[in-house]
Amino acid sequence: MAKIERKRIPNFTEPEDLTHQFIKMKDGRRMHVATVGSGEAIVFVHGWPEFWLTWMPLANKLKDDFKCIMPCLYGFGLSDKPNALRDDLNAEFHANDILQLVEKTCEKPPVLVGHDIGSHVLQCCATQGARKGSSLYPAGLIFFNCPTPSVGEEWISHGHINEIWYQSFHLTQLAVDLVGCSSETIKIYLEHFLRHWSFRKEAYEPFLSKLLETFSTKEAIYGGFSWYKSNNKARLKTIAGEKKPYNPKIKIPSSVLWGRHDPILRSNWASYLHENFENITIEFAEESGHFVHFEQPELAADFVRTKLNKWTQESG
């Protein structure tokens, strides 16, 4: 059981040595990437509604020992964005972008860290990398929540269907128009999820103004909502029990630190992880909800550092 961390406001401060760059994808799109620190590379993959800055409280605690690479997925933050809802921006699409980023910025296989959308992307990076025989196949995977195909009808059982209404709402142009109607509607909508999904309700507040700024355009709304439109077929197949555990299982060393109080990706779903991963350890953040990385950044940093040190020793 992970230790309980005292309440403190997370540090979203951008350090002086933080750098920003744009990486061009093979099709010409630009991916924005923020980088800080030096040492072994860690690539962080965010969720919705987030962008690279969501990782800063964690990166501030890791940057003295690790090179923290924090991209904005296509459609998010400062990366290029679509000008309409799209149905092809699924986990495979984003995983391909992350693998391109790794090839361009990492000298050896990095550890990937993710949650929410990022957890789907990391699983795809593992399966895609295995199929393609990538020379930069991830060295390890760290998750702060990790839904898998095995979750199945749990998505709609035990009242959970009431939590996932937004996933269908985001499929529509109506959602884009209503949410993006004004700066106030954007704030009301996004803050609802930040507050509802957090156990530490104050943790997101230092992040809020910059988050709202990045979601202030219709293109940014399209970008985020396109994930849900693109993932919808896979989501419905999962709920119907038509998606089976990975075969073969993901073999990369993996670890999960799941927020005990996550209301949308429930921590009891961790029981399905061993059906999909050959080598995975599971711990729980007892005072976190959905956003472990900024609700309990010290705990998250200790977790990342411990796992990387362990994997390095085992591989050496």
Role assignments for model-derived ranges:
Residues 33-35:
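Conserved hydrophobic "DFG−1" position in protein kinase catalytic cores
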Residues 2-24, 29-31, 41, 49, ...:
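Flexible "cap/lid" subdomain of the alpha/beta-hydrolase fold that forms the substrate-access gate
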Residues 304-316:
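Short, hydrophobic alpha-helical segments
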Residues 57-61:
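Typically the conserved alpha-helix immediately C-terminal to a functionally engaged Cys/Sec
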Residues 63-72:
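Active-site machinery of serine-nucleophile hydrolases
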